[in-house]
């Protein structure tokens, strides 16, 4: 700001006469002094800049307050299955670690959403040895030893576990763990710490088990004579399940043994599965196999995840090499688009039209065939999804609706192509010009790395502030379960629901039924209830959310304006070879010196829109439990409206930044000028937007798919020295990395095309190709428009 407003020799305000702008929607007039982005400009939207700086100071204070009063350790405290905080609540104050009864349950794909469903208990220390109840061969002579190794829930009295039968009942009811692995604490959670190369732990008879042949069996459905069809379906499915499971178990063992990563298998008791299959118990109770199938599935998911991680650790260097190659491939593709853009676009359009035409023809043939043979269109009622889908496609009405839908899409597409064919040609020409502009100022390709780093800083900062704010407050504990307990007595007058202190509760409340006076209560406790948070913290949370959205949008706007200045300078330079070498640096300095207020204004508008959309998503999530059709419809309409509004505002903001980069006007004036210019060329705008969007997506998809195919071919061949479990894992990672990198580079290309498009529209309105008013556009664009220099 000092350079902007405190130095008169650097900045000279321009008057309205410096640049001739039209009123309302009149075309732009010729200005002999206009040579591209103005060097004489002033600070824009200073009140918005002052507001933004003030907000940043307030956000900084929020961060300082959060760090001073918050404690992240409070958020990392584990909670057992009964809701007790390990090491915090009175019953588990001396047990700070959390152990899982069946860790394989935590390998399910929906765990981040639904949580880990296995029983979880607090313990004083993590298990220091492996334990499996079935393998321990429980008998009266070793029952005491087994009981000492058991890990059970807090309300279980181990002294009651006097026989093996009682222990089995407690394990079956999930009150004690059947298996336990040696583990170490990680963030106060006991995580398995198993050495590799324990393949020998698999029973010998299991490793040498011959393939099992399935036998057909009947179910009790034979008794239902009136449901013969259902019986046949059920019999077939169960028979297939038996055969599949037999092959699945043996194949699983073969694969896991080959990859030497089966140390967990000793906990699965696979021999029970094999015995069940061999004895034929499925004939009488086919559901007996269900728990074994679930166990096999869970451990398979866990081992698959482990092998994927092993593949990544083994191949990460080559993955980085292929991603680095994708950077080079992206640059080559952008440079080549000036030659391949036209055939790529037209081949894609013709391909889509051809595919739709064939779809219409095929749908019509199917419709006629089914109408002519109605007997063949029998609908098979079956619970099988594939059968249900097949029944749909045997209906003439299904093909009629498909025919109508494809015909409408085809007609609309043909009309759009016919009406916009000339505009599509112009859009392709601008794509070629964009490729030239990016190649002329090659540093712009890597410039998006700067805003990406800044956005990463904003995300990390806002997340840390969120976590520290969430940890602020005083924990509130209340007495729970005292009324229902017949043996727990508190000598200090604690009553049910009273606010309590865990230490005082342990000292003054005792279980009178226990042998020793010092035994704590098991049926009642001082439970953590909530965190008493100061009211100002909620306000700070709101400030943090606003700061996150505003700064993310601000950084994105900064990138767009800098690139717009660079590409506008390239367009309005007649001799492209004389383009300033540090044109990108000039764009940065002009934006920082003069237009941060404009960026703050535009980004605030987008941020408000995003916040409203986030609130609507939150409300929709909360109201899903209520089955109210009217409420859902209103929310759906609001979400759709604000999505459309945000998309329009993003489009308008980008063009406003381009106009501001050229003329140095404030946000409102720039947005008005850009909107007027675009509305006078609305068909060209539509064609350019759709063609460029489609081409960019196609290019990114083509590039990412090609690099993924090369990666998979490499790892699936004999070239690499490493042996991977899944060659597709590095291929998927390379696909994702390449797509992200291509998106970064093509974001520059997108700004280039939009900037050149606005400059092109101004060029054809300001100039006529005469000696006095020559065009700035290339000869290719002049030829397409049927214009030439006079």
UniProtKB/Swiss-Prot annotation:
Which keywords are on file for this protein? Glycoprotein, Membrane, Transmembrane, Transmembrane helix
Molecular function GO labels: transmembrane transporter activity
Listed as disulfide-bonded, the cysteine pairs are none
The glycosylation sites are 102, 259, 384, 483
Instruction: List the InterPro entries.
Output: Choline_transptr-like
Q: Localized where? A: Membrane
Query: What is its membrane topology?
Result: Multi-pass membrane protein
Q: Which domain of life is it from?
A: Eukaryota
Q: Write out the transmembrane intervals.
A: 47-67, 288-308, 319-339, 344-364, 400-420, 449-469, 545-565, 592-612, 691-711, 728-748
* GO biological-process terms attached to the record: transmembrane transport
Task: Give one Pfam hit by family name.
Answer: Choline_transpo
The entry's cellular-component GO terms read: membrane
Family that this chain belongs to: Belongs to the CTL (choline transporter-like) family.
Question: Would you tell me the protein name for this molecule?
Answer: Choline transporter-like 2
**Organism lineage:** Eukaryota, Metazoa, Ecdysozoa, Arthropoda, Hexapoda
């Amino acid at each position: 700001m000092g350079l902007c407003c405190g130095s008169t020799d650097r900045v000279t305000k321009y008057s309205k006469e410096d640049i001739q702008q039209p009123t309302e929607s009149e075309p732009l007039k010729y200005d002999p002094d206009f040579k591209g982005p103005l060097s004489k400009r002033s600070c824009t939207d200073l009140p918005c800049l002052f507001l933004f700086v003030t907000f940043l100071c307030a956000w900084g204070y929020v961060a300082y307050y959060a760090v001073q009063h918050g404690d992240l350790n409070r958020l990392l405290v584990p909670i057992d299955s009964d809701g007790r905080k390990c090491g915090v609540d009175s019953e588990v104050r001396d047990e700070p670690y959390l152990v899982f009864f069946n860790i394989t349950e935590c390998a399910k794909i929906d765990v981040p959403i639904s949580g880990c469903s296995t029983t979880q208990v607090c313990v004083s220390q993590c298990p220091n040895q492996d334990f499996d109840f079935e393998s321990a061969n429980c008998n009266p002579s070793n029952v005491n030893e087994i009981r000492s190794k058991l890990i059970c829930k807090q309300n279980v009295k181990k002294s009651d576990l006097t026989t093996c039968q009682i222990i089995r009942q407690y394990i079956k009811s999930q009150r004690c763990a059947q298996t336990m692995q040696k583990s170490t604490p990680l963030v106060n959670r006991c995580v398995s710490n198993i050495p590799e190369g324990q393949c020998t732990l698999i029973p010998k008879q299991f490793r040498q088990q011959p393939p099992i042949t399935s036998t057909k069996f009947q179910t009790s459905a034979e008794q239902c004579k009136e449901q013969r069809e259902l019986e046949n379906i059920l019999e077939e499915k169960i028979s297939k399940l038996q055969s599949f499971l037999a092959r699945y178990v043996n194949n699983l063992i073969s694969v896991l043994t080959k990859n030497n990563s089966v140390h967990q298998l000793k906990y699965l008791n696979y021999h029970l599965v094999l015995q069940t299959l061999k004895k034929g118990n499925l004939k009488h109770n086919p559901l007996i196999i269900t728990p074994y199938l679930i166990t096999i599935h869970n451990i398979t998911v866990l081992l698959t995840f482990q092998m994927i991680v092993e593949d990544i650790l083994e191949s990460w260097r080559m993955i980085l090499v292929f991603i680095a190659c994708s950077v080079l491939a992206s640059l080559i593709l952008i440079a080549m688009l000036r030659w391949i853009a036209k055939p790529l676009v037209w081949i894609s359009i013709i391909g889509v039209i051809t595919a739709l035409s064939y779809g219409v023809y095929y749908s019509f043939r199917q419709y006629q065939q089914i109408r002519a043979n109605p007997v063949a269109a029998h609908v098979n009622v079956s619970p099988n999804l594939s059968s249900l889908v097949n029944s749909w496609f045997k209906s003439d009405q299904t093909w009629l609706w498909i025919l109508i839908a494809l015909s409408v899409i085809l007609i609309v597409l043909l009309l759009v192509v016919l009406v916009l064919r000339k505009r599509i040609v112009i859009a392709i020409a601008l794509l070629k010009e964009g490729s030239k502009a990016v190649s002329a100022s090659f540093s712009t390709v890597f410039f998006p790395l700067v805003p990406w780093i800044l956005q990463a800083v904003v995300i990390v900062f806002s997340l840390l502030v969120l976590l520290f704010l969430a940890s602020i407050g005083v924990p509130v504990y209340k007495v729970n379960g005292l009324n229902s307990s017949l043996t727990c007595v508190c000598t200090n007058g604690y009553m049910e629901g009273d606010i309590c202190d865990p230490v005082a509760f342990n000292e003054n409340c005792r279980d009178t039924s226990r042998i020793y006076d010092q035994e704590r209560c098991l049926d009642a406790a001082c439970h953590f209830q909530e965190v008493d948070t100061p009211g100002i913290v909620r306000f700070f949370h709101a400030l943090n959310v606003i700061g996150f959205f505003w700064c993310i949008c601000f950084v994105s706007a900064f990138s767009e304006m800098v690139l717009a200045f660079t590409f506008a300078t390239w367009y309005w330079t007649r001799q492209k070879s004389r383009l300033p070498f540090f044109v990108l640096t000039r764009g940065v300095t002009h934006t920082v010196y003069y237009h941060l207020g404009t960026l703050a204004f535009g980004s605030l508008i987008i941020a408000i829109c995003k916040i409203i959309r986030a609130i609507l998503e939150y409300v929709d999530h909360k109201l899903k439990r209520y089955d109210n059709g009217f409420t859902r419809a209103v929310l759906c309409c609001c979400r759709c409206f604000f999505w459309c509004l945000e998309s329009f505002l993003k489009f308008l903001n980008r063009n406003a930044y381009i106009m501001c980069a050229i003329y140095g006007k404030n946000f409102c004036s720039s947005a008005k000028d850009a909107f007027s210019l675009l509305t006078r060329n609305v068909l060209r705008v539509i064609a350019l937007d759709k063609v460029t969007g489609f081409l960019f997506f196609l290019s990114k998809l083509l590039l990412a798919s090609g690099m993924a195919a090369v990666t998979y071919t490499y790892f699936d061949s004999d070239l690499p020295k490493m042996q991977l479990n899944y060659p597709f894992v590095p291929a998927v990672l390379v696909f994702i990395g390449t797509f992200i990198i291509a998106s970064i580079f093509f974001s520059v290309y997108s700004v280039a095309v939009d900037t050149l498009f606005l400059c092109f529209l101004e060029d054809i309105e300001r100039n006529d190709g005469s000696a006095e008013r020559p065009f700035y556009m290339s000869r290719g664009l002049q030829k397409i428009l049927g214009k030439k220099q006079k």
